[in-house]
Regions:
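Acidic, glycine-enriched loop/beta-strand segments at the rims
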Residues: 63
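Flexible, glycine/small-residue-enriched loop-and-beta-strand segment within the central core
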Residues: 1-60, 77, 88-89, 95-97
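Short-chain dehydrogenase/reductase
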Residues: 49, 67-68, 73, 84-86
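Short arginine-rich
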Residues: 78-82
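A short acidic/histidine/glycine-rich donor-binding loop in glycosyltransferase catalytic cores
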Residues: 83-84, 91
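A glycine/serine/threonine-rich, flexible loop-to-helix segment
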Residues: 97-103
Length: 103
């Protein structure tokens, strides 16, 4: 996790191994002395499951009760609640009611 602006992670989230969450490009690109790539907040709402090897970049907004599949890249996307997303670029796979861990 690399935070230069703001990263908000809700309650009961599950973030698997080898994930990257970064709200900055870690460098500035200036056009006519104006910063063209500012840092941007990341919001991950409650009960989101982020599977392994996923990258979430600046400007991402993941609504509650989402699943983000393994090896996905979330770039400035708004992911709607109660859905499974996967891929690079990220795509909606299906809608569902809820997810939970099995005992």
């Amino acid at each position: 996790v690399q935070c230069l602006k703001s990263i908000k992670i809700g309650k009961e989230c599950s973030i698997a191994w080898n994930c990257t969450i970064i709200d900055s490009d870690l460098h500035g690109i200036f056009i006519n002395n104006i910063l063209s790539n500012p840092n941007s907040e990341i919001i991950i709402e409650d009960k989101v499951w982020v599977c392994s090897n996923t990258t979430i970049t600046k400007g991402a907004y993941i609504e509650k009760n989402c699943i983000v599949g393994a090896n996905s890249v979330v770039v400035k996307n708004k992911l709607k609640s109660n859905r499974i997303y996967s891929g690079s670029p990220i795509k909606e796979i299906k809608e569902f009611e809820r997810w939970g861990q099995l005992n």
